[in-house]
Amino acid sequence: MENGEAKQSVPLLTPYKMGRFNLSHRVVLAPLTRQRSYGNVPQPHAAIYYSQRTTPGGFLITEATGVSDTAQGYQDTPGIWTKEHVEAWKPIVDAVHAKGGIFFCQIWHVGRVSNSGFQPNGKAPISCSDKPLMPQIRSNGIDEALFTPPRRLGIEEIPGIVNDFRLAARNAMEAGFDGVEIHGANGYLIDQFMKDTVNDRTDEYGGSLQNRCKFPLEIVDAVAKEIGPDRVGIRLSPFADYMESGDTNPGALGLYMAESLNKYGILYCHVIEARMKTMGEVHACPHTLMPMRKAFKGTFISAGGFTREDGNEAVSKGRTDLVAYGRWFLANPDLPKRFQVDAPLNKYDRPTFYTSDPVVGYTDYPFLESTA
C-alpha cells in the first residue's frame, strides 16, 4: 500500500493482537443503541449499517442487546433470547465477517431503566433495589422518559438472571458472533448492583464493595464458562452517574473490578473515561483510568469523548490498547481511513440517533470517496 508509512506513524492505525484476534488497527466501533430493531428483532438494514463500518481486522461491538424479556427499556432495541433473534442476527454477523471484521455482541439488562410498558404482562421492572428513577428528558430535548418504580429482586431470583446472560452468550455464539461484551456500565442492571447510591441491599449482594460486585462477577464467571474467557469482554463505567447510578468511591470500585476480572482470564475490559460523567458531555475530572489499566492483565479499551488526536496520544503513551468511538464512527462509516489520512469528519446528526428510519441518519452518512 502506497501510504503504508503514513499508516505506521498513526498510533491508532497500528496492528494489535487481542488474544486470538489479529486487529489491523485500534479504532473500535463502540456499542451504540440505535432503536431500529422493530419488535426487538434485528433487521436487514443493520447488516448494511455494520458492514459499512467494517474493515479487515477491525473490531466492532453491537448495540446493547437484551438477554431476556425483562431486559428491555427502550423502543425497538434488539434481543438475543429467542430463536427468531438468533436467526435474524446471522446475516448481520455474516456481513461483517465477509469484510474481515471481528464482531462481538453486547449483552444487556436495563434493570430499573424501564417501565411497565416494556415488561412482560405490564409488570414492574427489576433491580437490586426498589429505589425509583426520576423522569429523564430524552435525547431530543423535548420528550420525557418515565420509569416505573422497580421491584427489588429476591435473592433466589438472582441465579436466574445470571443464567439469562449465560444463555444470551450461547445464543450469540450460535448467531456466529466472535464473542460477547457484558454491559456492566451506564446505570443499567449490573451497574445498579455495583453502585452504592443505588444498591441498598442487606444480603450477600449488598453492603460491602465485594458484595456489590458479586452479581457482576457471577455473570462474568457464567459467561466465561459457557463460551470461553477468550471470547468475553466487559464494559464498565465506575466514574459515571448515568441514570442516577453513581458511587461514593468510584476509584476503589474500578480498581476492585479490574483486579477481580483477572481471576476469570477474560479477553478485555472496556472502560468509559472518568470525564464522561453524564451521557455525551465531557467534564473536567481528577480521576484517571491508569490504576485500572495497570491492574487488568488483558486488553484494555477506553471510550468516551475521544478525538483522533487524544486517541493517538492515549495509545502512544500506553494508557490504553484500543479506543472505542461512538458518535464519530456513527457519522463516519470509514472512520479508520479518515484517521489514517487525517481527513475532515462528517458531523453527526443527533436528532436521528434514536429514530426508527432504516436509512436516514443510519446508513446514509457519506464515505470519503463520495464526499470528494
Curated annotation (Swiss-Prot):
Gene3D superfamilies xrefs: Aldolase class I
GO biological process per UniProt: fatty acid biosynthetic process; oxylipin biosynthetic process
Statement: the UniProt record of this protein carries the keyword Oxidoreductase: yes
InterPro entries recorded: Aldolase_TIM (IPR013785), OxRdtase_FMN_N (IPR001155), Oye-like (IPR045247)
Induction summary: By wounding, locally and systemically, by cold and heat stresses, by jasmonate and by UV-C. Up-regulated during senescence. Seems to not be influenced by UV-A and UV-B. Induced by the explosive 2,4,6-trinitrotoluene (TNT).
Annotated pathway: Lipid metabolism; oxylipin biosynthesis
Domain of life: Eukaryota
EC number: 1.3.1.42
Reactions this protein catalyses: (1S,2S)-OPC-8 + NADP(+) = (9S,13S,15Z)-12-oxophyto-10,15-dienoate + NADPH + H(+)
Record-listed FMN binding positions: 31-33, 64, 106, 235, 303-305, 326-327
Residues found modified as N-acetylmethionine: 1
Tissue localization of expression: Mostly expressed in roots, also present in leaves, shoots and flowers. More abundant in cotyledons. In more details, expressed in peduncles, sepals, petals, around the abscission zone of siliques, maturing siliques and developing seeds.
Family (UniProt): Belongs to the NADH:flavin oxidoreductase/NADH oxidase family.
Function according to Swiss-Prot or TrEMBL: Specifically cleaves olefinic bonds in alpha,beta-unsaturated carbonyls and may be involved in detoxification or modification of these reactive compounds. May be involved in the biosynthesis or metabolism of oxylipin signaling molecules. In vitro, reduces 9R,13R-12-oxophytodienoic acid (9R,13R-OPDA) to 9R,13R-OPC-8:0, but only poorly 9S,13S-OPDA, the natural precursor of jasmonic acid. Can detoxify the explosive 2,4,6-trinitrotoluene (TNT) in vitro and in vivo by catalyzing its nitroreduction to form hydroxylamino-dinitrotoluene (HADNT).
Annotated protein name in UniProt: 12-oxophytodienoate reductase 1
